C-alpha cells in the first residue's frame, strides 16, 4: 500500500486518537497528546463526513470536557491546529478552547507566575552625557559606563566602576547631539570588568587600575577621559 506523507500522518493521528478513545472508555482521564489527537481526529473525521469547516470545529469543541482530561491539560491545550481535507479542498482548522474551560489558571502545573516589579535602583551619581556622534547610541544596564561609546562626552573618571541606574536588561538611548543626564550606581559583585571596550580587563579596584584605564581611554580618543 503506497501512502503519501499526508496519508501517513493521518493514520498516525488516527492511531493516537483511537488510543485516547480506548483509554477514555476505560475511565481514564486524557493527557495532552491524547486530548490533542482526539480533538484533531474529530475535525478530520467530520471533514470526511462532508461537514463544513465551522461544523467540524464545533464538533471538535464538543468532544471533550474538563472532566475528561487530567488537571492542567486545559491550560496547555488552548488551541489545536489541524489541516483536514474538506469537500472544497484542504483547510486549516483552528479549534480554540477545545476542552471547554476547566483551566486551573495560576494553579496549573508549570504555570508562569509574574514576579514582583523591581524598583529602579537609586542613583549614587548623576552625570550629564552628550552624544557627539551622528547616529544614536544605546548603552545597556550592566555595561561598564566608563567604557561606553567613545563619542559620548562625559566625565569618565567619575563614571569608572559604575553602571546605569536602570532595571536589569533595559537601556538608555542617546540621540545624535542629545544631552542627557543619567544616574549611575557602582558595579556590584566581584567588581571585575572583562571585555566591554578592553580598557580594564581585570579587577576594577586593583591598584593603579583606574589610572591605567583612563590612560588607555585618552590614548584611544574617548571623550571626557582627560578631565
Swiss-Prot record:
Keywords: Cytoplasm, Hydrolase. It catalyses: urea + 2 H2O + H(+) = hydrogencarbonate + 2 NH4(+). Its EC number is 3.5.1.5. It is found in: Cytoplasm. GO terms for cellular component: urease complex. The keyword Cytoplasm applies. It comes from the Bacteria. NCBIfam families: PRK13192.1 (NF009671), urease_gam (TIGR00193). Heterohexamer of 3 UreC (alpha) and 3 UreAB (gamma/beta) subunits. This is Urease subunit gamma/beta. The gene is ureAB.
